[in-house]
Design a protein with these regions (language model features):
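Terminal, regulation- and interaction-focused segments at domain boundaries
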Residues: 1-32
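Long protein-protein interaction modules used by eukaryotic assembly/scaffold proteins
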Residues: 2-10, 48-60, 64-91
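Short, contiguous, helix-prone interaction/anchoring segments in small proteins
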Residues: 23-55
Length: 91
């Protein structure tokens, strides 16, 4: 019997229109919280979703264009407990 795949659980899904300045402020707030606390919290009404990445993340960037619609995506994934691997140096 093949191993079962883990079930995908959607913890947050939200879309809204923002100005480019509002979006930039959101990205800056996420970056500030990650640097200071190692996590950030999305608040939607009374619900809160804490996003706490591991030390090591995989980052993907994608920019696409279809007709006059442009899409730029930033995605980062991690495994719980993943630590940054030591970097090799030469002396």
């Amino acid at each position: 019997m093949p191993p079962t795949k883990p079930v995908t659980e959607v913890l947050l899904k939200h879309k809204e229109h923002q100005s480019a300045q509002e979006f930039a402020a959101t990205l800056e707030k996420i970056a500030q919280k990650l640097r200071a606390e190692g996590q950030f919290t999305f608040v939607q009404g009374t619900e809160q979703v804490i996003v706490a990445p591991s030390d090591q993340v995989k980052v993907s960037y994608e920019y696409t264009k279809k007709g006059d619609k442009h899409s730029f995506e930033i995605e980062f994934d991690w495994y719980e407990g993943a630590r940054a691997q030591g970097k090799m140096g030469i002396e």
